[in-house]
Amino acid sequence: MKIVFALGGSVLMPKEGASVDKIKEYADVFKKMKDENNEICIVVGGGNTARTYISVAREFANESFCDEIGILATRMNSMLLISALDNYAVKKVPENFKDAEIILNLNKIVVMGGTHPAHTTDAVAASLAEYIDADMLVVATNVDGVYDKDPRKHADAKKIKQLTTKELLNITGSASIEAGSSTIIDPLASKIIDRAKLKTIVIEGAPEEILKILNNTHSGTIINP
C-alpha cells in the first residue's frame, strides 16, 4: 500500500521540545510499516517550532515571509525524523514532488516538509498523495478525528466517525490559513482531497495509533470520496 502521512509538527515536537525516545518511537513505527512492504511518504509540520518563530517574525514581516520561516521549520523537523530512520531514508529533505518521487522509487521512506508559501503541510501532503497516486492519506494530529466543532474549545463537540470529502469541505470551508495555523485539515487540503478523491484518515498522532491504520483498528475519522 502506498501511504502519505501528514504528521503534525506539534505531535512530533511537543511544547516541551524534542525527545529522543519519542522520535525513535515514530521512526520504529514507520520502519515497521516499510518492512511490511508499504510505500511510505511523510510530510512533517512545523508545529511549535514554527509558531514560536512566526509569532516573533510577524511583528516585523508579512505573511509570505512568515510562511518561509514556517517552511524552514518543517524541514528542520523532517531532518530530525530522517536522522532516526537510518538507511530507511535518504539523508536529504526533498523540496518538490519530483524529487520525492525519485526517493520513493529508490525504495526509501520519503520525509519532507513544506514547499510553497500559503500551503500548509496538510495541503502539501494531499498534493503529494495525488501526485504519486497514493492509496491513502493519513492526517496524524493532536486531535483524534474530525469533529463538528473544535473539541479543544467546545466541550459539546461531537466526533464524526465517517464522512465524505464533500462534507469535509463544508466543515473546513471557513478555517484560517495564516502562517503557522493549526486547523485539523485546512480548506486547501480539503479541496485537494475532494478533487483527487483521496481516501483520508484523521487520527490522533500517537505512534501506536498510526500503526493501527494497517488493520483498520484505529479510532479516527474515515473520509471517503
Curated annotation (Swiss-Prot):
Alphabetically ordered keywords of this record: ATP-binding, Cytoplasm, Kinase, Nucleotide-binding, Pyrimidine biosynthesis, Transferase
Keyword set includes Transferase: yes
Any one Gene Ontology molecular-function term assigned to this protein's record: ATP binding
Keyword field contains Transmembrane helix: no
InterPro entries noted in UniProt: AceGlu_kinase-like_sf (IPR036393), Asp/Glu/Uridylate_kinase (IPR001048), Uridylate_kinase (IPR011817), Uridylate_kinase_arch/spir (IPR011818)
GO CC field: cytoplasm
Binding site for ATP: G9, S10, G47, R51, T141, N142, Y147, D150
Signal peptide span: none
Pathway in which this enzyme or protein is active: Pyrimidine metabolism; CTP biosynthesis via de novo pathway; UDP from UMP (UMPK route): step 1/1
Binding site for UMP: G46, D67, T115, H116, P117, A118, H119, T120, T121
Pfam families to which the protein is assigned, alphabetical: AA_kinase (PF00696)
Reaction catalyzed: UMP + ATP = UDP + ADP
Regulation: Inhibited by UTP.
Localisation per UniProt entry: Cytoplasm
Transmembrane segments: none
Binding partners and assembly: Homohexamer.
HAMAP family the record matches: PyrH_A (MF_01220_A)
Protein name per UniProt: Uridylate kinase
Organism listed in the record: Methanococcus aeolicus (strain ATCC BAA-1280 / DSM 17508 / OCM 812 / Nankai-3)
